[in-house]
Swiss-Prot record:
GO terms for cellular component: cytoplasm; nuclear speck; nucleus; THO complex part of transcription export complex. Belongs to the THOC2 family. Residues 164-534 are annotated as: Bow domain. It comes from Callithrix jacchus. Residues 293-339, 896-965, 1464-1491 form a coiled coil. Residues 1416-1425 have a biased composition (Polar residues). The keyword ATP-binding does not apply. It comes from the Eukaryota. Keywords: Coiled coil, Cytoplasm, mRNA processing, mRNA splicing, mRNA transport, Nucleus, Phosphoprotein, RNA-binding, Transport. This is THO complex subunit 2. Residues 1251-1263 have a biased composition (Low complexity). The modification Phosphothreonine is found at T1385, T1443. The modification Phosphoserine is found at S1222, S1390, S1393, S1417, S1450, S1486, S1516. Residues 1218-1234, 1265-1285, 1294-1343, 1353-1383, 1449-1504, 1524-1585 have a biased composition (Basic and acidic residues). The gene is THOC2.
Amino acid sequence: MAAAAVVVPAEWIKNWEKSGRGEFLHLCRILSENKSLESSTYRDFQQALYELSYHVIKGNLKHEQASNVLNDISEFREDMPSILADVFCILDIETNCLEEKSKRDNFTQLVLACLYLVSDTVLKERLDPETLESLGLIKQSQQFNQKSVKIKTKLFYKQQKFNLLREENEGYAKLIAELGQDLSGSITSDLMLENIKSLIGCFNLDPNRVLDIILEVFECRPEHDDFFMSLLESYMSMCEPQTLCHILGFKFKFYQEPNGETPSSLYRVAAVLLQFNLIDLDDLYVHLLPADNCIMDEHKREIAEAKQIVRKLTMVVLSSEKMDDREKEKEKEEEKVERPPDNQKLGLLEALLKIGDWQHAQNIMDQMPPYYAASHKLIALAICKLIHITIEPLYRRVGVPKGAKGSPVNALQNKRAPKQAESFEDLRRDVFNMFCYLGPHLSHDPILFAKVVRIGKSFMKEFQSDGSKQEDKEKTEVILSCFLSTADQVLLPSLSLMDCNACMSEELWGMFKTFPYQYRYRLYGQWKNETYNSHPLLVKVKAQTIDRAKYIMKRLTKENVKPSGRQIGKLSHSNPTILFDYILSQIQKYDNLITPVVDSLKYLTSLNYDVLAYCIIEALANPEKERMKHDDTTISSWLQSLASFCGAVFRKYPIDLAGLLQYVANQLKAGKSFDLLILKEVVQKMAGIEITEEMTMEQLEAMTGGEQLKAEGGYFGQIRNTKKSSQRLKDALLDHDLALPLCLLMAQQRNGVIFQEGGEKHLKLVGKLYDQCHDTLVQFGRFLASNLSTEDYIKRVPSIDVLCNEFHTPHDAAFFLSRPMYAHHISSKYDELKKSEKGSKQQHKVHKYITSCEMVMAPVHEAVVSLHVSKVWDDISPQFYATFWSLTMYDLAVPHTSYEREVNKLKIQMKAIDDNQEMPPNKKKKEKERCTALQDKLLEEEKKQMEHVQRVLQRLKLEKDNWLLAKSTKNETITKFLQLCIFPRCIFSAIDAVYCARFVELVHQQKTPNFSTLLCYDRVFSDIIYTVASCTENEASRYGRFLCCMLETVTRWHSDRATYEKECGNYPGFLTILRATGFDGGNKADQLDYENFRHVVHKWHYKLTKASVHCLETGEYTHIRNILIVLTKILPWYPKVLNLGQALERRVHKICQEEKEKRPDLYALAMGYSGQLKSRKSYMIPENEFHHKDPPPRNAVASVQNGPGGGPSSSSTGSSSKSDESSTEETDKSRERSQCGVKAVNKASNTTPKGNSSNGNSGSNSNKAVKENDKEKGKEKEKEKKEKTPATTPEARVLGKDGKEKPKEERPNKDEKARETKERTPKSDKEKEKFKKEEKVKDEKFKTTIPNAESKSSQEREREKEPSRERDIAKEMKSKENVKGGEKTPVSGSLKSPVPRSDIPEPEREQKRRKIDTHPSPSHSSTVKDSLIELKESSAKLYVNHTPAPLSKSKEREMDKKDLDKSRERSREREKKDEKDRKERKRDHSNNDREVPPDLIKRRKEENGTMGVSKHKSESPCESPYPNEKDKEKNKSKSSGKEKGSDSFKSEKMDKISSGGKKESRHDKEKIEKKEKRDSSGGKEEKKQYPFHLDVFSQYNGKL
């Protein structure tokens, strides 16, 4: 009673008379306001009455009080008696159950008190008979019960009996006659009804039988629908509604026998009655068979059977017998004619569809599984017919093709049928819904299929061209989505069930091609992955298609492509997704199937080709496939096969490329570059643009010509018939705006792949991915350049600064993309200017070309400034930078040889055609015409390129003076040129590699101011280790081509003096004195002569050998692979020297042995190079033939034979080399001798050249170094300790035969202490005495190994006594060596490099190597700090010279006097001339120098002062080559007279050299002091010349 307390609280009952009664009445009044029976207030009202009555039963309230209040409440509601009776009914049941007499008595009294409120009749309905008896309402409860049963039986179970004997047959006869009469007259249904009523009454007919007879007649006269429906409506007004439904149900039940067949007329009557709502579908549905659960079971059984068939078809059959069994089973299944059981629900559905009652038909289909009803052909055809009728007006308006008549479809006469569609909007009302219920079974009606497709095509045309309001656009968007759903759920599945209908496939493509490829591919994806599982029929079709595809693919070969292709085409018309999925899976496994499959696809429809493109993309995007092989170093074969197939199939057939291109772009956006392989293949096959690093030189030369020459001679295969396919590719790129995005993504991915893949992937794979990105970018860029028009290119490619700064494109890629745009733009401007003035002269044409170049390139010059920091433009001008990056090989040279070669090929071909007697005359004529036309095109193209190159060269000639600014040193200029121009571009492509080499040569030939060709070549060849190590495989190949072309030029100059004199003799690029003023005058004394150039070339060859050996000995995969590739590329021009070639051969042979089992690819490379190297061994020459070199004197010490750090001379011949290797003792002794001699040579040769090589600052630096010698003495002790560490000679490192010989040679250099002691210049008497003592001690140590040690000590003392005399002799020696025949010539013998590597302690060497590793320059030049250290060391040695064997003092003085007189005369003349030149230069440039800022002066001093040294510092990773001491000995002996080989005579000569060197030192010191005064007084005045002596390029003369 908790709920009762809520409605009627106990307090109300307690205070009933005071307030409770009023509260209760108020509550009931409120609850009675809502009269609804279903509202909550009604239930609360019932609850309140119940609680009040219950309180009376419990005795809390008197029944009089309750009856009074209930009487008052009865006024509130009319239904009060009924509610109160319900309450009494509940209380009656409860009190009976309680069996408490008091409560029962209270209940009886309450009811009796309320009898005036509730009638007896109501109480008799609700209360129990026993309660009624106790209340006195009935006499006996038992009698009451019996009477009630009788009445109910009579009402519900007794039927009125119409006895047929009593019913007269005449009545039924008259009824049938009445219904069967002619109804075309004036008879109406009302009149008919009155007659029927009369007959029923007259003959006492059963009304139900009369209704049944009316239905029978209606069934036989279907044409009078309206009449009978009106009659039945009128008749049913007199009957119960269920009667008609029961009679129909009885009729249907009659035909539900095992062999019964329900007549269609009955279905039609039922359908019409349903349509006119005379019966309810739910009432009739229960009378029909089969039951819904039986239908569901049947559907499931069909799916299970379909899956069973799939399992059978996909089962692996091992024997031929089983195959035969399977074929027999298939035949039996086909023979079975399935007789469907009588399904009354489907029959009624068909009738509903035929009369156009779509709503009731839809309700029936909703009760069944999806597509169950439509899977029955009659139902499907009925739906199709209804759709035909509904879309007829719209199809007649928009779908009928021009010229076609068509067969009109008559509309239904039924007004209740769906309305016909007049517009696309009307299709939404019913038609799309009908298609959804029809599903894949539209296949039964191909005509309707075509109609729907044509309507869809018309809608898409209207949709794409419509510019209506926003509301209309929203409506059309909805219709578009409906068409897409129809295509997904109806059209494509129906096509799968059609029997190879190619026409329907083409018709469907007419609509599909108007969809964007995104919509199409979504539809194909649903078709392939979802649709075939939605219906048992489609499951079977899928299995059968796969089975057939397997059969065809097993038999597909190159020989039977045509018949197999026809079978594939036939199978693809209906089920392309399943077929192509299987074919692609086979291609991924067996790449030899690619060619026959591509050839067999020529019988496909357009839709099938589009589906093929989708299937390819889906196969590529398969997440379950690994894109790398198990070794993680190579791309998987399945991906390579698919890529190859893509290229072939997209080239041969007109397939839409947009989806594939977008897929590649999306993969790049996601940072995945594997799929670039696809793009590479597609571009190669479709456009004929081939990217390979294995191009021959003939092909490479052809690639520098015009487009025709490229096509004929630039590729491995003949490029034929690519015009259409390349046009298709171009259109796809432009239509979807993918041209530039793909380029930018590739360029960004190229740089990003290193960081994205670097940590996880193998270095070899990362390199391949980088190369793939780069190669595809180059290939794609070439395609765009050759196929896009000027307007398209300019419209799509932004300016260079936008590309680099906004899109973050690397500079090399940005210029690569922009270069064709500049060329197109210049060409179009030039053509415009030519047209404006026709018939102008050649000079005017050149002028116009230059004008057009300026117009196009001026904005580019401004744009490139933002690409680098402002400091860069102090070294090179933006114009030079832009010119370098904008030109190509096509602009620089004409490949006459290639043109001639291709023309000759055509001539031979024409001759072969003439000689061919079997060829038909017509074909012969056509072929000859083709060859002649091609020949004319080539000749015309050659002429056009010749004119173009002439114009370009004229332009460059005018521009060259502004290219390189004189604001910075030539060393820095070359650094920036190499760093920003040469190195980035030479590894971009093979043609760019050739271009870079030719451009350097061109800049040299143009006599470009401020450009040092010598320095440029030296920086390129000096140290290639880091460049090679940082390259990928393809970049190494390109870098090798670049070095090959550079070596070709150098070798041409080296091989012939006349060529050298002609091309280099008077060129500013070969000046050895570098001037900061920009004046590169042709002073012959400043030029490098031919012999010294040959020394320099030998040095370069030695440097290449040293770098190669270093890379080969590292053991690193990348180092070894890349250096082998580079060496293979430069093989035509290197090695030329026999001992260098032998050194390389030994190292490569070692690689072959070591890598044979470990790394097969390195082994293959090494073996290939080794074989080629051996084949060129006959072309190698000894070193003395390569550059001029005197044979060594018989008794010469090692110091004469070897340069500092050079190899022992015994290695120059085979026998001496063998003796060195066989005898360890002899090797050690010769090394000690050579090192003791080397220290003296080093001191002498490091004096003046070090000062000269410092480019202007050397004088002051040397002077300061001499003054600071006292400070250095403390450091010398530490240095002596370091010098004790083992140092390896260069020959031991570079040219050692094997690893076992190295430890023998890597011993401490004992004479380092002696050298360090001698390098200290004595300043006082005490110091001299100390110096002498140290010299004695150290000389005694080496007495056993050096025969002339005592003579050294005496000579040292002699030098200390006469320092001024030695300086005079040095000066004389300088004048002797520099004056030949009246003109100044630089002599390498007097110039010396810094300390060799073998003399540098190990820690110091590591420091230098680390500095070089971190140096920003591409050529790895040294830092200023290192250079200054070496300058100090060399300056400290300024007054220390050779220590030859002693001579008698008298002889020495006599010879000294003679030499001194001669040298003084020459030195006076030289001083006068130098002073005069210096004054002139000072007067010419004093104004300019005053304007130079002090910080710039300082920077120039520092940078130029180290220029000469920097080259040696760059050699630190390996042993630096230094001047040949034999050549020096030769030069020195010429200046001091002839000698015949004795030790004393040799000592006399060396003494002269040392004294001559000191004289030169004093002469240089005077110049330095003058310059220091000038610097300290002026402050702003800059030095005018920077001596760039040959020590920078001096070579090792070490024997190999």
